[in-house]
Amino acid sequence: MGHDQMLRVSKVDEWLRRAPTRPDMSTHGDCVIIRSADGAQGIGLASGVTSQSAGAQGLCLNLVMIPPGRRGMPHFHDGHETAIYTVSGQTEVWHGRGLAKRTVVRAGDFMYIPPGTPHLPVNRGDVTAIAVVARSDPAEAESRVVVDLPRHLADLLSLPIVVQE
């Protein structure tokens, strides 16, 4: 075994010694399994892979559920990208400066949200919208900055807020 290979193996061994040891996680070598029932954080969010749950250093991955007639909080993630895959249902996402743009996101759609871009998911449909959300922020909600709802979206104030993202 060459010097480079030995160095790589020793770095992996070192990393494995630092692997998370929480009792609610199963570890298999360098893999961590987070059972979805273990991560539920109220209505709307099943916490998955985060720095807290898996020791993730560069991403988080969660399942977001928005029941019919509900919305999220208008917010942005300071310095972190977001990628969303809609599994089922449909949402309208208000985004951009002043939340002036509206995009309908359907099951099977992917959506990319650049760092610092305000966004607001709304479910006006009749089924729960379910999406897988990945962010380049391993601390889950640490970088979330809530913004005011603009006047042109005042009708959304009557919709209950879902605890999410």
Region roles according to the model:
Residues 90-92, 118, 128:
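Structural motif
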